[in-house]
Amino acid sequence: MADPSSYRPAPGTIPTQPGVYRFSDAHGQVIYVGKAKNLRNRLNSYFQDISALHPRTQRMVTTAAHVQWTVVQNEVESLQLEYTWIKEFDPRFNVMYRDDKSYPWLCFTWTDEYPRVFVGRGAHHKGWRYYGPFGQAWAIRDTVETLLRVFPMRSCSTGVFNRAKNQGRPCLLGYIGKCSAPCVERITSEAHREIADEFCDFMAGRTTKIVKRLESQMAEASENLEFERAAVIRDSLGALSKTLERNAVVLGDGTDADVISMALDPLEVGVKIFHVRGGRIRGERGWVADRADDADEAELMETFLTQLYGVNASDGQVRDDGHGNAVPPLVLVSAEPTNPDVMSTILSSERGSHVEIRVPRRGDKATLMDTVTRNAQETLAQHKLKRASDLATRTRALEEIQESLGLDRAPLRMESYDISHIQGTNVVGSMVVFEDGMPRKSEYRRFSIKGFEGSDDFAAMHEVLSRRLRRLIEDRDAMAAAQTPDGDVGSLIDPTTGSPRKFAYAPHLIVVDGGAPQVHAAQQVLEEFGLEDEIALCGLAKRLEEVWLPDEEWPVILPRTSEGLYLLQRLRDEAHRFAITFHRSKRSKAMVESVLDGVSGLGETRRKALVSHFGSVRSLRKATVDDIVEVPGFGPKLAGEVVAALSQDKPAEAINTATGEVVDANGPDAGR
């Protein structure tokens, strides 16, 4: 590893203008490319205290041996040059969004004399037209089968086409009306290309013109008493209607747009894009990438747009609108890129006309963005599930944790704890269990903190761990007392409850959320019960994802792509999620009781019915008298008193103790 100071540029030699820089290793291989408004400020940040850098950035600057830069005139040029260098050098420390190459596309071999339509995957060919990608291959194949009745163009392979041509006899599709049989010259090359062009128009969303033309032809055939021809056209219209029904209108104004959303976690980012043409979803696609540093969603979005409409567009990987334009006139995003005007200028240049980039705030575009966001979250969740459920991956993760933390065995049972509250009220704790790298949800536990009042995370964690470890000791003692004279161990079933003694199993590793202070507090509890030599302990700090051990001055830094770190993060995040869920439930119940104390005739049963029906105080506040009357046990008079009580009680501000953010105490995100 190189010392960054060994290749640091001399003071004053770095310009203050905007530009693009690149780090290279000792072999001259470019390993990172970046851009900056002020090159001096940005590059100097890499040569400060290395411990303050992001772990991945630390590895980059210690791997590098040289740094070079190029000054440009403005941010547009810097973004373009950055993209060019990333494409040319493929630097391994840059975030690269790579998608599943198995996505199916609808392909038109436009460079052939008689273009062919087929469903394909993999690399794209220059000059061909592509539509998609699509989520399911069977769905687009079914659509093609239907549309070939309306647009009878060639769909056979080159071998089949040449064989039919040599034999002078078309294949079956030519006989059943699903191909115009250009192989036997039933149709000219120009006429066949017109059919293919109409097929492309339909896939691009320009359906109105085609439907009107067919309706006009059907009416004309009927007037001329050509009923057989009219019936064929009627069937074609039915096929089009069937296809359009499968692909409902999502944007009523017939917009051409790409709708892009991101789902983030500390280690990875999931991206989903819906290609909307003519107001209908014509394709979708998903990506997952490792987060290389602490870049926020705006920076990640800028990187993604650059790669999507730069690298992918040049390779034919972005949906064409039928006119050779990979970039639509409107790009809807879940977060604006860092430099939206600059990005808009670049995309406008790529398209040849103005491209608008914006975040939808209301209407059908905002509704569609919500759908794309849910799909992005699902893309990331499915990726994480696939990664976590693989046996070889889980085994490697446990081995990495064992080696990195210096454990004498793999931590087959791990437990993680978290505390949740708002301003010291409704303090709760959670315990989640992973066995063999997978959640064991039947052994999750929730704790209502009873030993103190107020906001003291350390005292709350002390109580939670003490209660858990006390049960461990008690269950062990009970098992020892039940040991038979012949040496058989006591039953793992509690004779008083008939339930398994689940607390009798000691964890191999306890994971707490936090750094050195949180680990020290948890270690004190282990020492109080004499379990510090039996149960290993670590803390996982947010942001830098450092692993802290008891009595260690420095944290353990696991590689960013480590399966061990990924497993520890999942365990910690699951404890956080479980604690917040319990806190919200408890807080909602307490708020209902507090707000409705003065309403006569409203007992515990009816309060529970309100909470069950509306789900939260926030939803209950929005309810009208008519809404509340629908709840069993509530008449108009009682419902009116509830509405009056809620209108007098205004929600107070609350502080999220994890972030310091002011939140709505009744909101869905309140709680820590």
Curated annotation (Swiss-Prot):
Major localization class: cytoplasm
Top-rank lineage group of the source organism: Bacteria
Domain GIY-YIG: from-to ranges: 16-95
One CC-aspect GO term: excinuclease repair complex
Keywords (A to Z) from UniProt: Cytoplasm, DNA damage, DNA excision, DNA repair, Excision nuclease, SOS response
Biological function: The UvrABC repair system catalyzes the recognition and processing of DNA lesions. UvrC both incises the 5' and 3' sides of the lesion. The N-terminal half is responsible for the 3' incision and the C-terminal half is responsible for the 5' incision.
Tagged with keyword DNA repair: yes
Every UVR domain range: 208-243
Subunit text: Interacts with UvrB in an incision complex.
Record protein name field: UvrABC system protein C
GO MF: DNA binding; excinuclease ABC activity
Underlying gene: uvrC
Pfam families listed in its UniProt record: GIY-YIG (PF01541), HHH_5 (PF14520), UVR (PF02151), UvrC_RNaseH (PF22920), UvrC_RNaseH_dom (PF08459)
Sequence similarity: Belongs to the UvrC family.
The organism of origin for this protein: Cutibacterium acnes (strain DSM 16379 / KPA171202) (Propionibacterium acnes)
Subcellular localization, as worded in the UniProt entry: Cytoplasm
Record bears the keyword Nucleus: no
